[in-house]
Amino acid sequence: MLDVHPSGFYAWLQQPHSQRHQADLRLTEQIKQFWLESGCVYGYRKIHLDLRDSGQQCGVNRVWRLMKRVGIKAQVGYRSPRARKGEASIVSPNRLQRQFNPDAPDESWVTDITYIRTHEGWLYLAVVVDLFSRKIIGWSIQSRMTKDIVLNALLMAVWRRNPQKQVLVHSDQGSQYTSHEWQSFLKSHGLEGSMSRRGNCHDNAVAESFFQLLKRERIKKKIYGTREEARSDIFDYIEMFYNSKRRHGSSEQMSPTEYENQYYQRLGSV
């Protein structure tokens, strides 16, 4: 059941259905949907941002008014996870320099971490993306944001691709990436590190773009009761849809796998 006051909600429903009132009804349904997707913790400011991102044009005061009218409010005491502050041990220069379209696979990879809400708690996802095809070549999901999550994602990428030449691996300056373990892994596998400038998310725009797609096309449409449900659904999105089927404008409207296959077919015919 929603934490909504029935008397206020049903009294409001019985008002004359003016054009404005009908628009408010539709908007309130969207507000309730975003509120549910947040685990019932979002207030009017965050829900306004979700509405804006979905293409809905409305003022923040209108969202506040409608939420107050039907009794929807944020649940306090439930905060988003914060990245732990670690010592910035080793920071690599920004060697990628926003060169997001290499000429071949396994020239440049980008990596990043995001978090997913479940009723059991937070779940963290690290991915490695090949910039040539936008394919997710490595990923790892854990309930804690430790160094292992980024190392496991990169290990999967190395195992799957087995690059025969040095690959540039770009990340932000999160503590997982500035650790000695990360730098040691890069060196031992013949990889070269690159990092975004501090506080500049556009330096890692492709990884950010994938997370936006994942959340818009899958996560925001679901409410995960358990971490295992989320893991299974994210596996399905990455391996069964995104890599093999999802078309990309940057890849001539082909999926990442199709785009790479076409590249190797052309290479073999030369």
Predicted regions and their residues:
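Charged DNA-binding/catalytic regions of mobile-element recombinases
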Residues: M1-V270
